[in-house]
Amino acid sequence: MKKPVVIGLAIAAIVAVIAGGTWWYQSRQDDGLTLYGNVDIRTVNISFRVGGRLASLNVDEGDAIKAGQVLGELDHAPYENALMQAKAGVSVAQAQYDLMLAGYRDEEIAQAAAAVRQAQAAYDYAQNFYNRQQGLWKSRTISANDLENARSSRDQAQATLKSAQDKLSQYRTGNREQDIAQAKASLEQAKAQLAQAQLDLQDTTLIAPANGTLLTRAVEPGSMLNAGSTVLTLSLTRPVWVRAYVDERNLSQTQPGRDILLYTDGRPDKPYHGKIGFVSPTAEFTPKTVETPDLRTDLVYRLRIIVTDADDALRQGMPVTVKFNDEARHE
């Protein structure tokens, strides 16, 4: 065989190998489902549960935040005063309840009995005086006005006696169950007010609810804040979720737990790894923010993909290409 022919065959073989390799690579790249999504934006608006003057803020925008970290404080003074007042209220209610349970002392009962005897004597005198006045009035010795004054004194003495007798009876039988129950309810109410005062004072300290990065610092020390008004906005950096959408035709490929490859423009040759964590049970129209070659009017299902090897380069809102090919199972 002539030398030029051999060279030609060799070149043809090389071209065939290159073409075959290119076709194989492209077929591997195009194999499987490809979706487009974004890293979920997850933020928390942090606020005080109570209102007041902002005394301090210990963090600034961009700071890394740890769960349980003290972020700021309100002026404690009004809430410390309310707490002392609530403690005093509990002491008063407790003393009243204890008094109701203990009943009356022997000395108090003796004093009440003496008051009854005194009232009885006063009534007897008033009754006798009234009787004498009646006789004098019949004989026209006194006027009708004198008789009426005697009757009024007798009635007043009778009322005083009745009051003293009722008091002695109460002292001897003890407090009524209804009075004891009312005193107990007052004590429980005072304790509840104390617990609320303690909670309010505790809530003058702002605690980070989770790890993350501080996005915004909305107010500055010295500001008067209403309860619930936003003080800080925290970006939740872990776990990292990717939101993507799949149409009904490919829904069967998106079982929860399936391994996924995630590509970003910043590192196209080094994918992140993830797993499908959630598939929405209801369809929706494709959101405008999603990059997709299909019609945006298609009904799709939302996916949540949990990134298992996320780093700080994977930022919230970043566009992501989601690959479902077999490479995800082996990497």
Curated annotation (Swiss-Prot):
Residues 107-208 form a coiled coil. Gene3D superfamilies: 2.40.30.170, 2.40.50.100, Helix hairpin bin (1.10.287.470). It is found in: Periplasm. Residues 1-19 form the signal peptide. NCBIfam families: PRK03598.1. PANTHER family: EFFLUX SYSTEM COMPONENT YKNX-RELATED, UPF0194 MEMBRANE PROTEIN YBHG. HAMAP family: UPF0194. This is UPF0194 membrane protein YbhG.
